[in-house]
Every structure is written in structure tokens, then in C-alpha cells.
């Protein structure tokens, strides 16, 4: 599963783990990605989305129809 949110566009960040002695090791900071299934009344079907935690909250506030319309407008196939 790709670490990419379909709503917010959140992607992994890169940086360093820093030990107590301040040695640095490269690492990757992954977003909190979840697969979530929603019923979309306008499409009359279920849609499975790959979402970050913030993307799930966005759907709670704006509604699934509005968010799916934006995703489809970007040309992403659902």
C-alpha cells in the first residue's frame, strides 16, 4: 500500500533519527495511512479510499460526496 493520502496528499517525509550521542541515521516519517470504505450516495456504490487520519477528519466535516467530487475532478479513478 502506498503511503499517500487520496484526500490531503500527505506523503512520507524524510529526515534523521538522532541518538543520544547525536549520531544521525536516515529514516522515513510515514503518515498515518488507513484504508477506509465509504458508501457514496451520488455514485450509488462503495468506494475504498487510502486516507490519512486528517483525511478521515476532512470527510467527517465536509461529507463524502463533496470530497469524492474533488477527487474525481482531479482525474483520479475510484
Curated annotation (Swiss-Prot):
GO MF assignments: structural constituent of ribosome
UniProt keyword Transport present: no
Gene Ontology CC: ribonucleoprotein complex; ribosome
InterPro entries, alphabetized: Ribosomal_bL28, Ribosomal_bL28/bL31-like_sf, Ribosomal_bL28_bact-type, Ribosomal_bL28_sf
Keywords: Ribonucleoprotein, Ribosomal protein
The UniProt record lists the keyword Ribosomal protein: yes
SUPFAM superfamilies, A to Z: L28p-like
Chain positions covered by the region annotation Disordered: 1-31
GO biological process, one term: translation
A Pfam family the protein falls into: Ribosomal_L28
Family of the protein in this entry: Belongs to the bacterial ribosomal protein bL28 family.
NCBIfam families per UniProt: L28
Protein name, UniProt field: Large ribosomal subunit protein bL28
Gene name of this polypeptide: rpmB
